[in-house]
């Protein structure tokens, strides 16, 4: 793996450099765990280049199934980075990795990549606040699952979690397992029920105690993952784990709130939650 040591390959720099706008870099980050490079979009707040002595918090943004590292690098992401005064880091999850270290595919080690390799790489390259108080993680759908999965399991790395309509218990969605790529991640369900159970966010949530995490969930009432997120909410409530659960009213159609426009609205709320955490040390929407 020596070929990856210290390797940095910037393939596109400064996609947006107009005055007052976040600066975007698309980079390739080496992963020793997977033996290859992963595309990552990094969003730097406009102030980053003007204040060379300032260190910035970092928000890791995980895309959903079928999307890529550019998903969060939209107008909402850029505005969030500028107004929030944080660095946005958007890794590519190979389409449908579910941000797991796959128990059936050793070539997919995305938990290790994001929570360990990417965090270390970002902290070594950019002026970051290199502690959990300076890091948060968010994502939508598969990315919301990923944010919870990594945030619950790496509490010393990420200080706040923003779950946007996450697939936090996909066992109830049997008809979608194949198209969502879950069989490639976790194997056949009937032959690997224990593996599937261990890899659900609701299973990890049951291990949490009050104060372990700062979590905000945003989900629409017209979302096929609504009940999954309500289940997560019930588990945390029953265990007296403080968290925020926000439901936004949508149409009755179960897909009306599982869209990019809804994600953008939810992301703006999540970014406000993170700003409060970074500036006051307390996660909240006040």
What are these regions (language model features)?
Residues 1-3:
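N-terminal secretory signal peptides that target proteins for export/translocation
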Residues 20-286:
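Non-catalytic cap/lid and distal C-terminal segments of serine-dependent acyl enzymes
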Residues 6-16:
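Bacterial N-terminal signal peptides
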């Amino acid at each position: 793996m020596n070929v990856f040591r210290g390797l940095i390959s910037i393939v596109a720099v400064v996609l947006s450099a107009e005055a007052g706008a976040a600066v975007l870099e698309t980079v390739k980050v080496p992963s020793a765990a997977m033996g290859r490079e992963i595309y990552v979009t990094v969003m730097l707040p406009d102030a980053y280049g003007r204040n060379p002595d300032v260190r910035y918090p970092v928000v890791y943004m995980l895309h959903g199934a079928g999307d890529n590292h550019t998903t969060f690098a939209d107008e909402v992401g850029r505005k969030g980075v500028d107004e929030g005064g944080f660095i946005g880091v958007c890794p590519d999850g190979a389409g449908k990795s579910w941000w797991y270290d796959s128990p059936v595919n050793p070539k997919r080690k995305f938990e290790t990549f994001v929570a360990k390799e990417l965090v270390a790489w970002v902290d070594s390259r950019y002026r970051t606040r290199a502690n959990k108080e300076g890091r948060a993680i968010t994502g939508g759908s598969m990315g919301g699952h990923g944010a919870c999965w990594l945030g619950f399991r790496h509490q010393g790395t990420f200080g706040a979690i923003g779950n946007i309509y996450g697939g936090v218990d996909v066992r109830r969605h049997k008809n979608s397992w194949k198209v969502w790529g879950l069989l490639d991640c976790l194997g056949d369900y009937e032959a690997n029920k224990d593996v599937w159970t261990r890899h659900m966010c609701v299973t990890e949530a049951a291990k949490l105690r009050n104060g372990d995490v700062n979590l905000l969930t945003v989900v629409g009432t017209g979302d096929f993952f609504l009940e999954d997120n309500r289940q997560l909410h019930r588990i945390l409530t029953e265990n007296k784990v403080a968290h925020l659960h926000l439901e936004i009213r949508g149409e009755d159609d179960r897909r009306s709130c599982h869209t990019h426009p809804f994600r953008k609205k939810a992301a703006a709320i999540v970014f406000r939650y993170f700003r409060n955490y970074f500036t006051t040390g307390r996660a909240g929407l006040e």
